[in-house]
From Swiss-Prot:
Organism of origin: Crassostrea virginica (Eastern oyster)
GO biological process assignments: defense response to Gram-negative bacterium; defense response to Gram-positive bacterium; innate immune response
Keywords, in A-Z order: Antibiotic, Antimicrobial, Defensin, Disulfide bond, Immunity, Innate immunity, Secreted
Stated name of the protein: Defensin-1
Main location: secreted
Database matches in PROSITE patterns: INVERT_DEFENSINS (PS51378)
Xref: SUPFAM superfamilies: Scorpion toxin-like
Functional summary from the UniProt entry: Has antibacterial activity against the Gram-positive bacteria L.lactis and S.aureus, and against the Gram-negative bacteria E.coli D32 and V.parahemolyticus.
Similarity remark: Belongs to the invertebrate defensin family. Type 2 subfamily.
GO annotation, cellular component aspect: extracellular region
Pfam families on file: Defensin_2 (PF01097)
UniProt superkingdom: Eukaryota
Amino acid sequence: GFGCPWNRYQCHSHCRSIGRLGGYCAGSLRLTCTCYRS
């Protein structure tokens, strides 16, 4: 979701839009957008 696995930047932007520091594509096939705070 949110651009994963192909568009990592879209995931990162989504995470920033909800108040996180950024995000990356995670999971076995990098299908999940995972946000991080620090």
